[in-house]
Every structure is written in structure tokens, then in C-alpha cells.
Regions:
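Residue-level marker of beta-strand positions
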Residues: 72-73, 92, 140, 160
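Glycine-rich beta-strand-centered segment in the early N-terminal region that forms part
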Residues: 12-30, 41-81
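Mid-domain Rossmann-like dinucleotide-binding core that forms the NAD(H)/NADP(H) cofactor-binding site
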Residues: 113-183
Length: 183
């Protein structure tokens, strides 16, 4: 696979990838894709060099977009962040406004990144499930990969909403852990 190297570098805004919103990053998280990128596996990075981090939560410093103003609390998840564009493992990020989401009421930056991309992905899947009228009365829900990031969040959300959950993991060392919760 080639040599992988890492370095810490002082950068200016001019060094960051293009975008119309500059965000002071308060929190980010380390995701599976970040680990793949850092190890040079998975063909995640589309350009080099690049700041890692596929999500971030913070506060708008400046914006050329009418949709955001200085002081707005925001988050960015996916959309090529940390793959094609400089990511959230930095003090400041510049991103396209089309990828920026206002921080939902009742959610703070730390909590948003504690859930991170895995939580966001699980929530989107469950939202789609509910849009397709998958109710608790229709029977149990099987969650594969239940010991991983997305799966574990999905299991917790589903069980908290009254669904019967069958948690499945290919990792035998996690079977007793999943049985302990008796979803």
C-alpha cells in the first residue's frame, strides 16, 4: 500500500480547501473512515495533504453565505470532509455552506460529536425506517453489526423507542456483551 506519514503543521486560512463558511471547531470525533485514512488503507483520501476528520461541530467565524452568520452553532458530517476537503480534526475548518447544518435545538457540540457520524448514520436509517411505516407492532428488527459504532447506536435508539431488537455481531467476543443488554 505505500508509505503513510503524519505531521502537525501550522496553517493559515489560505492553506485550507475552498469553502464559503469558516468554522471554529469545538469538537470532532475519530471514525472508522478516519482510521482507514490514517493507516493508508481503504482508499479514503482523495487528495494529499489533507486534514483528517469526517465530522465537526463548532461556531461560525465568518460566512459568505446568507444562510449562516458569525456565532451560529453548526455541525458538518460527511460530504467529503476529511476525504476530499480539509476535515474537522483542526482548530478551524473552511467548508461549503451546502454541507453545514445548524445545530439542532437541545443538542450541544460535545454531544453531537459523541454521537458522531455513527450516530448520525443510525438516526438517518431509523428515520427512513419510520418513513416506511416500520412500527413496533410489525415485529422485531434485526441489527447486524450491532457491536460496531452505527449498529450499537441503532440498537440503543430502537430499544429506547420500544422496538424488539435482535442484535447480531460477527465478532464472537462481543456476543456476551450484547446478550447482557437483553434488547
Amino acid at each position: 500500500s505505500g508509505e503513510v506519514s503524519h505531521q502537525l503543521t501550522d496553517m493559515s486560512l489560505d492553506d485550507l480547501t475552498a469553502g464559503d463558511v469558516v468554522i471554529k471547531v469545538h469538537y470532532s470525533s475519530v471514525n472508522y473512515k478516519d482510521a482507514l485514512a490514517a493507516t493508508g488503507r481503504g482508499k479514503i483520501l482523495k487528495q494529499f495533504p489533507l486534514n483528517a476528520g469526517i465530522d465537526l461541530a463548532g461556531e461560525v467565524i465568518s460566512s459568505e453565505s446568507a444562510d449562516f452568520k458569525q456565532g451560529d452553532k453548526v455541525l458538518v458530517n460527511g460530504c467529503g470532509l476529511g476525504e476530499q476537503f480539509d476535515g474537522g480534526l483542526a482548530q478551524v475548518a473552511r467548508v461549503s455552506s451546502e454541507f453545514v447544518i445548524p445545530m439542532p435545538n437541545g443538542l450541544d457540540a460535545k454531544s453531537a460529536m459523541a454521537l458522531g457520524t455513527a450516530g448520525f448514520t443510525a438516526a438517518l436509517a431509523l428515520h427512513r425506517m419510520q418513513q416506511n411505516d416500520q412500527t413496533q407492532e410489525k415485529g422485531p428488527i434485526v441489527v447486524t453489526g450491532a457491536s460496531g459504532g452505527v449498529g450499537s447506536v441503532a440498537v440503543n435508539i430502537l430499544s429506547s423507542q420500544g422496538y424488539e431488537v435482535i442484535a447480531v455481531s460477527g465478532r464472537e467476543q462481543y456476543h456476551s456483551f450484547l446478550k447482557y443488554f437483553d434488547f
